[in-house]
Each structure stands twice: as C-alpha cells, then as structure tokens.
Amino acid sequence: MSASLETIQLPHLPSNLPVHIGLYRDVNNAPFLRQQLLSGNADFEYAFIDASMVFSRAHVLSAIFRAVNDSLNGRLKSRNVHSEIVFSLSPANNIAESFRKFGITDLTKDLLVVKVSVTPDITHNSVAEHLQQSIEGLSVPFTDTSLSEIGDVAKIKKAYKLGSLSTAQDDDKRRLELSLIGAIALRGAT
C-alpha cells in the first residue's frame, strides 16, 4: 500500500467527498500514466500534476477546493473534476495551456496525484492499492517540506507572471503563496 497516501476532508465541502493525495518522486513511467489519461482509461481518472509546479499544500488544496466546488455547482469547464483540478491550478482560462504547464508530461519525474471520492467505491484503500500497482516511483509524504524540495519556484512564478516577487525570506514565501491562491480564486472572475 502507499503509506504516504493522505485522505483529506476539505472544509466547506460535503463529507462524502474526501480527497486522496499522493506525492511521488523519481517516477519512471510518466509516459504510460499520461497515455492512460489521453486514452480516457476510466481506471486512471486522477489529477496527475507535475509536482514541480506546486508551491505548497495550500496552493494545491485551493485548486482542489475550487474544482470540487465548481463540480458541485455545475460549473466544470473540463471533462471531470480531476481534469478541473489541473485546470484550476492555472491562472489562465486556456485548458490546453493549463495541462501543458501543470499536468503530467512524458518527462515528469515528480508527480502529485489527486483522486476525489466521487462514488462510494472510491476509498483510501482502493486508491492506495491502484496507485501502488500503477506508479513506478517513490511515495513521499504530502508535506510542505517535500513540496519545497520539489517545487521549481522560478517556473511557478513565471506561470503566474509573478517574476518580480522575491522569495528570499519566509514573509516573501508567504506572500507568493497568497498570490498563487488569489490567482486560483480570481481566475475567470468578471
């Protein structure tokens, strides 16, 4: 089993929609996983996110909340809640661009995997078992420490057009995190 798979109940969302999150390093089969997504294999309906584009837990949890909330309110702009999570990470309204920047590629080595329990048969154990069988990589804890080792701050700042924002001090890192969360919340607002 994936010892590091974390199941989270997001506040302000129904209790029957827990979210399962796994973080993997040194993934060797990204092309296979990406192909499963592209072919529409329902067994691989996950949000496969390039972890180098994730700054913190709060950053990705904000995108998950937005996607699940949009799903519950009939406002999905993509195929399903899992693709919407990847789309929600993007500050732009272009779905294809969001997948290029934030989604899994054939070269992805560090992978964040998210699964929302949209049906009762999706449980912590079923997700952990499937990921253990499917992902060739090292499962690591989904922590801010792990994400800070993986995240490419320069790429993240470029994607969000925040190049001038410093990240030298803890206050600067907090300001960047709040800017990322704000971009997620405001994308598409008119």
Curated annotation (Swiss-Prot):
A Pfam family per the record: CGI-121
Oxidoreductase listed as a keyword: no
Gene Ontology annotations of biological process type: tRNA threonylcarbamoyladenosine modification
Primary localisation category: nucleus
Compartments where found: Nucleus; Chromosome, Telomere
Keyword annotations: Activator, Chromosome, Nucleus, Telomere, Transcription, Transcription regulation, tRNA processing
InterPro entries noted in UniProt: CGI121/TPRKB, CGI121/TPRKB_sf
GO cellular component term, pick one: chromosome, telomeric region
Transcription regulation recorded as keyword: yes
Family membership noted in the UniProt record: Belongs to the CGI121/TPRKB family.
UniProt function note: Component of the EKC/KEOPS complex that is required for the formation of a threonylcarbamoyl group on adenosine at position 37 (t(6)A37) in tRNAs that read codons beginning with adenine. The complex is probably involved in the transfer of the threonylcarbamoyl moiety of threonylcarbamoyl-AMP (TC-AMP) to the N6 group of A37. Cgi121 acts as an allosteric effector that regulates the t(6)A activity of the complex. The EKC/KEOPS complex also promotes both telomere uncapping and telomere elongation. The complex is required for efficient recruitment of transcriptional coactivators.
Subunit structure as annotated in this protein's UniProt entry: Component of the EKC/KEOPS complex composed of at least bud32, cgi121, gon7, kae1 and pcc1; the whole complex dimerizes.
Name the UniProt record assigns to this protein: EKC/KEOPS complex subunit cgi121
Organism per entry: Aspergillus clavatus (strain ATCC 1007 / CBS 513.65 / DSM 816 / NCTC 3887 / NRRL 1 / QM 1276 / 107)
Gene: cgi121
